Curated annotation (Swiss-Prot):
List of residues binding Mn(2+) 1: 272, 349, 351
Location of this chain's protein in the cell: Cytoplasm
Organism: Nitrosomonas eutropha (strain DSM 101675 / C91 / Nm57)
Catalytic activity: Release of an N-terminal amino acid, Xaa-|-Yaa-, in which Xaa is preferably Leu, but may be other amino acids including Pro although not Arg or Lys, and Yaa may be Pro. Amino acid amides and methyl esters are also readily hydrolyzed, but rates on arylamides are exceedingly low; Release of an N-terminal amino acid, preferentially leucine, but not glutamic or aspartic acids
Residues in the signal sequence: none
Protein name, per record: Probable cytosol aminopeptidase
Alphabetical list of InterPro entries matching this protein: Leucine_aapep/pepB, Macro_dom-like, Peptidase_M17_C, Peptidase_M17_leu_NH2_pept, Peptidase_M17_N
Keywords attached to this entry: Aminopeptidase, Cytoplasm, Hydrolase, Manganese, Metal-binding, Protease
Stored CDD domains: Peptidase_M17 (cd00433)
Function field: Presumably involved in the processing and regular turnover of intracellular proteins. Catalyzes the removal of unsubstituted N-terminal amino acids from various peptides.
EC number: 3.4.11.1, 3.4.11.10
Amino acid sequence: MDFAIQAGDLGKYYGDCIVAGVFESRKLTEAAKALDEMCRGYLTKVLDQGDMDGRANTTLLLHNVPAIGSKRVLLVGLGKEEEYVEKVFLEAIRAAFKALHQTGVKDVGLCVADLIVKGRDTAWSVLQSTLLVEESVYRFDRLKSKREERQPSLQKIIFLIGDEAARAGAEQAFKQGAAIACGMNVTKDLGNLAPNICTPTYLAEQAGEMAKTYNLKLSVLEEKDMEALGMGALLAVARGSHQPAKLIVLEYHGREGIEKPVVLVGKGVTFDTGGISLKPAVDLDEMKYDMGGAASVFGTLTAVAEMKLPINVTAIIPTTENMPGGNATKPGDVVTSLSGQTIEILNTDAEGRLILCDALTYAERYNPDVVIDIATLTGACVVALGHVVSGLMGTDEPLVQELLQAGEKASDRAWQLPLGEEYQELLKSNFADMANIGGRWGGAITAACFLSRFTRKYRWAHLDIAGTAWKSGKEKGATGRPVPLLTQFLIDRAQQH
């Protein structure tokens, strides 16, 4: 998809379709008013005939509008003006692109200048629109014998802004949006692949391709390397699978010198049966998404590399399957982690924290500025927060606040949960330094408490994306989250330094 900015007179746009908004009661936005004046009230006349009343997410496509340079005009309903908020804007843009894909348009002029939501600016509107158009053309059909015959015809979006002064910010926004969308597509593709294809070995191969494309430093630890180091927790999860586990490290050096890196640690369980603590059969196929944390780290690093951000980022991806078998870890087994701490494994389905704890300890050797782990860690987080926001906890409050603010900017929000010492009591074991589960209550918090025991040498935050990494049902598929949040966090950090 190509993007461009055009400022000034809407009459100078001569493309396939121009998109403008209409509020309820047929109230035209400023851009729609300008178009209406050009065509001498034609839009008002059509609306007065009852073809559209401006209700949210409705659309009206008009052809050959008099005195308009564009071949078509698409009017998009924005609902009540006093209720026009961010959610309405995003849904309106989705509705517009859905309608456009039913046509043969190749280029579109989007009037973003007067679609701005209170508290946002033109740059935000451009960035979000860029993400939404890329989302609208995303298809995952590589595993089908016959792909969809009709592919989206849309090739170019021209953002029509009223003020030339906003051009620089808008141009930067669509470039960032295109990079983030590229990263989200990487995350979606990895998540949507079948688990017999997307194995730990496949992820290591993809890391190799990525290292070549973006000139990254790559290292991969094999099981023998992990055993030599003493990664007993990660290897305990891998024991039931015929697929060898990997620990993948990708290093992006965007800033010269000795600046400490931001380390992103992504949980990469490419299929999670639960192990001996076997999961129910219902929706078990969705456990291919249990590598959503790893996929989001791949995607975020892609976005960073596409933008050539002046920042150092290290990605650490522990990856394995969690399978039952004669050699699988049993409930009650005690293992020694890389940190030297011992863990009683009471539930083999609490495996994500086991592979993460060794990866978090391994992160120490990179002398990190901060460490953020991303994981589809707990069903408890989904119970608490649903599928709208990601769970966020951490031992460093300024870091947590940075991530919360980045999520707000990116419209990819997280919500902070407590991480009090009182919860640590729930991880006590009679036979080891700790248990890998903390009982029925506060499961998302006790999982984070477990991880915190392996992060005492640096500033750390944890994103639980179990509710946001994928969708179920008719729209089943990976979402690409939290790539926007993480990328915005890194953009902000690069600008600060």
